[in-house]
């Protein structure tokens, strides 16, 4: 589960340390981002900064050094970033070899893996490094706005889903099973990175009260 948190002067504060009034403000923010979807949180990428908790490319977070993620497919690290609903957690995305990712790119068979985990800096081990990603960039939060152009952001958290392959109705197939759109990754905004053919990765989950449960990569599309 992803518990609520409050951003206070740029610092993440778990909701159990803040006042009732502040918790109400957080709930209102979640309401606008994931329920009424008036707003979204937008992320960009920039020069890699050591000791950050959000990056694309490079090595996986160190917490995966002793983890075996799949019995069947090779899995490679793609990106990680702090969960804005719980900045004490990170969300990491892994992908199999491209031919497998392409064959299984739709719901409910998508092979991309999402793992939520404790905060962890980049590993020194290249065990999960993606062989086709040479660059590494930090991921940072840009703004929380309404209708910011998706072409300008690497990740859009909340708001409305923005497909790039119109007519497939991938969103409708996932929503029909009771899932809700949580965030999307826009690879076209990532300089020098094109693992998914400048495509988009779409993450869904269950919204229960003011929490998101069981987030997963539902599908990805390419331009």
Put a short name on every predicted segment.
Residues 26-223:
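Preference for intrinsically disordered or flexible, low-complexity segments
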Residues 12, 24-26:
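Compositionally biased low-complexity segments, especially N-terminal hydrophobic helices
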Residues 7-11:
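Short Gly/Ser/Thr- and charged-rich N-terminal loops/segments
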């Amino acid at each position: 589960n992803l518990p609520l948190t409050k951003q206070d002067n740029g610092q993440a504060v778990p909701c159990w340390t803040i006042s009732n009034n502040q918790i109400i403000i957080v709930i209102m923010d979640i309401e606008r981002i994931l329920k009424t979807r008036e707003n979204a949180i937008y992320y960009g990428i920039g020069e890699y900064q050591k000791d950050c908790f959000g990056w694309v490319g490079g090595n996986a977070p160190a917490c995966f050094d002793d983890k075996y993620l799949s019995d069947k497919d090779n899995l490679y690290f793609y990106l990680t970033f702090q969960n804005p609903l719980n900045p004490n957690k990170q969300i990491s995305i892994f992908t199999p070899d491209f031919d497998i990712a392409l064959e299984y790119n739709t719901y409910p068979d998508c092979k991309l893996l999402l793992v939520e985990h404790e905060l962890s800096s980049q590993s020194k081990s290249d065990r999960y490094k993606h062989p086709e990603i040479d660059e590494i960039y930090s991921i940072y939060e840009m703004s929380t706005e309404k209708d910011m152009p998706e072409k300008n952001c690497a990740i859009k958290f909340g708001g409305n889903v923005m497909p790039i392959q119109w007519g497939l109705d991938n969103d409708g197939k996932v929503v029909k099973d009771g899932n809700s759109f949580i965030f999307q990754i826009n690879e076209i905004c990532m300089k020098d990175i094109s693992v998914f053919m400048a495509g988009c990765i779409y993450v869904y989950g269950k919204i229960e009260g003011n929490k998101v449960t069981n987030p997963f990569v539902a599908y990805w599309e390419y331009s």
